[in-house]
Amino acid sequence: KNARQVFAIETGENGLLFFQDNTPAYIIRRFDIARDGTKIKQEDFASLLGKTSLTHGGSFKYTGSYEDIATCIKRYVAAWQAEMAKFFKLVVFNYLFCNSDAHLKNFSLQQTPDGDYRLSPAYDLLNASLHVKDSDFALEEGLSPNLVKSDVYSRTGHPCKEDFETFGKLIGLNEVQVQKALHSFTGSDEQVKQLISNSYLDERSKRMYLRTYEERVSRFNRKN
């Protein structure tokens, strides 16, 4: 809900329904099936990067960096800058909302009716800290092994806004694109809090969700 309603990130259409015994069920419309029932070609980035359990071990989907995904986008997407801006925004979102399970198989390219490729709608967006011990990033090499870290990152071990600015430019975005994406995350705290408050999470999970989000925002905005 936060991704789609607050930050205008394209996601699969989804909803929550309840059975007669009040057991909840999360449903999502498949976005790899066209309205006429035909299959839409889609590949995740583990496949596009040639990574499997045979080539990279059991944790293959957690290997590499987000720069690897960006490089792959440039390789397969003709209008890559527009899709790169979407990808960059999604990386920032995952960091702010503690989605430390944003691995290679949770990003995909999808073929359009014209035969070219675009990022698929975002999926598996969750606050992983509610379920497991959290880390900043799912991928072992983080944003990029080539990232020149800010003083804050070097000192604290956690990236801040300056590091995402550097990463955005590293993957080929210009200053305007980077700042537009980052600006979209400012001034939305009240909307986020309201959505968390109105969610079907239990009260303990709501408090934890809000606390972890506020901690990430604080890290993100840290300058010293």
What are these regions (language model features)?
Residues 1-104, 108-224:
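Anionic ligand-binding catalytic core segments
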